Amino acid sequence: MARVKRGVTTHARHKKILNLAKGYRGRAKSCYRIALQRVEKALQYAYRDRRNRKRDFRSLWIIRINAAAREHGLTYGRFMHGLALAGVDLNRKILAEMAVNYKDDFTKLAETVSSKLAENS
């Protein structure tokens, strides 16, 4: 049986971590043990924040829809309820896009919602 030395695999593993640590400050970019800690923490942050990003965007969309709805005398909750009554099936992302970039279309939508709410109450 031939003797197996692990220098090649160790070097490859260290190189992989140090490549991931490019751009870090101080010894975190050049010292394997410190780089390993920093890279592991960075990956934890990345995992967590991929989930938080979804929450943050939904929150941003709701804020934008609420601001646009209030310009037309409606609150966010009443606006969304009115959309459901009117049978409008648009998600928050599209509604926020309309509120920011297509104000005329959003105004028509708000008028539709207002008429449905008045008709229903």
From Swiss-Prot:
Q: Which PROSITE patterns match?
A: RIBOSOMAL_L20
Listed under GO cellular component are: ribonucleoprotein complex; ribosome
Q: Does the keyword Membrane apply?
A: no
Assigned keywords, A-Z: Ribonucleoprotein, Ribosomal protein, RNA-binding, rRNA-binding
Which terms under GO biological process does the entry name?
ribosomal large subunit assembly; translation
A Pfam family annotated for this UniProt entry: Ribosomal_L20
One GO MF term: structural constituent of ribosome
Describe the function of this protein: Binds directly to 23S ribosomal RNA and is necessary for the in vitro assembly process of the 50S ribosomal subunit. It is not involved in the protein synthesizing functions of that subunit.
Query: What family does the database annotate?
Result: Belongs to the bacterial ribosomal protein bL20 family.
Q: Protein name, please?
A: Large ribosomal subunit protein bL20
